């Protein structure tokens, strides 16, 4: 019986799943947009959104908690110095999951995961804010 089991197993052991979600959260916070399968994207949302909420309050305890979950100093710095202030007025809903077709090899549903209100790059490489 699967009563009260709230997360997807994704055909991985618990340590592999934890490492994969940690790496995906690091990639998302670094690049602000990633492409992955739809079930992984939905699980990533459960990991990444609380981290961004944590980044809105830059205390030492929150930095240590974020580092224990991400294990990357550069990403923790970006989380508290750049992403936290950016989403200070937003109460949740920091990620957008867009379905983008199916993968060629196995027909798995794919999705783009991106941060809402991220600055978009123009064609000439300048940063343009999203309207």
From Swiss-Prot:
GO process terms (BP): translation
Gene Ontology CC: cytosolic large ribosomal subunit
GO molecular function: structural constituent of ribosome
PROSITE patterns: RIBOSOMAL_L17 (PS01167)
UniProt keyword annotation of Ribosomal protein present: yes
Keyword terms of this UniProt record: Ribonucleoprotein, Ribosomal protein
InterPro entries in alphabetical order: Ribosomal_bL17 (IPR000456), Ribosomal_bL17_CS (IPR047859), Ribosomal_bL17_sf (IPR036373)
Family to which the UniProt record says this protein belongs: Belongs to the bacterial ribosomal protein bL17 family.
Quaternary structure note: Part of the 50S ribosomal subunit. Contacts protein L32.
Identification of the protein by name: Large ribosomal subunit protein bL17
Originating organism: Methylobacillus flagellatus (strain ATCC 51484 / DSM 6875 / VKM B-1610 / KT)
């Amino acid at each position: 019986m699967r009563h009260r089991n709230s997360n997807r197993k994704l055909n991985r052991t618990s340590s592999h799943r934890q490492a994969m979600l940690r790496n995906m959260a690091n990639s998302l916070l670094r690049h602000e947009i990633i492409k992955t399968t739809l079930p992984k994207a939905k699980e990533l949302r459960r990991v990444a959104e609380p981290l961004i909420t944590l980044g809105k309050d830059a205390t030492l305890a929150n930095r240590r908690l974020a580092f224990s979950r991400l294990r990357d100093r550069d990403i923790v710095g970006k989380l508290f110095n750049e992403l936290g202030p950016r989403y200070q007025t937003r109460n949740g809903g920091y990620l957008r999951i867009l379905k983008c077709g199916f993968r060629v090899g196995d027909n798995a549903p794919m999705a783009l995961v991106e941060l809402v209100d991220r600055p978009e790059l123009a064609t000439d490489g300048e940063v343009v804010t999203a309207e």
